[in-house]
């Protein structure tokens, strides 16, 4: 079935390419007229060979626009007359899909590079230091030159984090990946060391930080631990920390590093809910209800990139995660926030979600 679908898409593209206006100039030479569309398809196949390259994004959007246009054209054929004529003029012999794709690529790049600060205001009945707590979440940085975040943008990222004046800084995984060069790792570890967070800095591993999905990374676990230790960042793996101010931070191992058999939420907090405000860090947005039942007050996750490329990213992430992006109320006392990522995965392109840091401001409710 996948092969038949691919053949059908190839045929659709070929027939549409035959309608391109420039080809009409060589219509009297069959070899050129029927051969040039094949060359164009070969070019698209070539630039799409890298699953992490922009070529596959470009080709995917182009094919999508051609499919939509063909479906509309076939529907209008049944009607005929003026609507069909107007459609042919609008479609301009197949040029419109190229213009739409170019527009999407331009907009997606701008959206990916725009670093936002997304603020959430929450309340709790539990006591907080001075009645308030500000948490900044950095997630899914994936630093590399061809992605949205690399060392050249560290000053901008640092300024946005410092503007929030965080009490607590949390890093929810995929801060690095298998494409991260040692220079990038050192630069970002230095950044985290320069940031001030009076209640501490905590980090949980993501599925890319140490796992080799695409290639052998240029750094190992020892390099990661050494860099974070120098920066004053504590790594949490199925561990909880009770801070002197009474706030608890729980960090979970990612599913990938436990073969799906990590500690349960109840095992991490065997005493269940208590009077300590509990910040729950889990790279992948799963198991929300069990975390809330165990005593989590605020769950912070990443991983999804908010979908990043619509609709493929949204469909893929929704299938495995309980939330794709944003805030979700889990229980009366518990909320979850899923970051869209402080960087992008693979390329400087985003049509869904935001490139962001999350600033969660929690205040203690006053009793009436």
What is the predicted function of each stretch?
Residues 127-368:
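Soluble catalytic domains of enzymes that build or remodel membrane lipids, polysaccharides, and related
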Residues 1-113:
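Non-catalytic terminal accessory segments
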């Amino acid at each position: 079935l996948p092969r038949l679908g691919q053949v059908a898409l190839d045929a659709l593209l070929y027939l549409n390419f035959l309608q391109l206006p420039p080809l009409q100039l060589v219509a009297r030479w069959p070899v050129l007229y029927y051969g040039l569309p094949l060359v164009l398809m070969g070019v698209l196949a070539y630039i799409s060979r890298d699953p992490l390259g922009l070529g596959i994004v470009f080709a995917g959007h182009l094919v999508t626009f051609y499919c939509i246009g063909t479906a509309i054209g076939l529907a209008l054929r049944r009607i005929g007359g003026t609507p069909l004529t107007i459609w042919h003029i609008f479609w301009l012999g197949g040029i419109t899909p190229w213009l739409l794709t170019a527009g999407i690529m331009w907009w997606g790049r701008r959206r990916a590079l725009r670093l936002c600060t997304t603020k959430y205001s929450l309340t709790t009945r539990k006591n907080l230091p001075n009645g308030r707590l500000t948490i900044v979440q950095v997630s899914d940085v994936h630093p590399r030159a061809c992605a949205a975040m690399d060392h050249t943008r560290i000053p901008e990222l640092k300024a946005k984090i410092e503007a929030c004046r965080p009490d607590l800084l949390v890093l929810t995984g995929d801060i690095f990946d298998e494409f991260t060069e040692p220079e990038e790792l050192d630069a970002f570890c230095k950044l985290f060391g320069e940031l001030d967070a009076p209640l501490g800095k905590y980090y949980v591993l993501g599925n890319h930080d140490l796992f080799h999905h695409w290639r052998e990374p240029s750094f190992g676990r020892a390099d990661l631990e050494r860099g974070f230790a120098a920066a004053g960042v504590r790594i949490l793996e199925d561990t909880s920390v009770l801070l002197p101010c009474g706030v608890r931070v729980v960090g979970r191992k990612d599913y990938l590093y436990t073969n799906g058999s990590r500690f349960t939420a109840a095992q991490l907090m065997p005493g269940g809910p208590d009077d300590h405000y509990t910040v729950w860090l889990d790279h992948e947005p799963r198991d929300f209800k069990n975390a809330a039942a165990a005593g989590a007050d605020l769950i912070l996750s990443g991983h999804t990139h908010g979908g990043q490329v619509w609709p493929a990213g949204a469909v893929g992430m929704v299938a495995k995660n309980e939330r794709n992006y944003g805030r979700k109320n889990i229980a009366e006392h518990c909320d979850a926030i899923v970051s869209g990522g402080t960087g992008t995965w693979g390329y400087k392109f985003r049509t869904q979600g935001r490139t962001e840091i999350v600033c969660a401001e929690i205040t203690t409710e006053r009793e009436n």
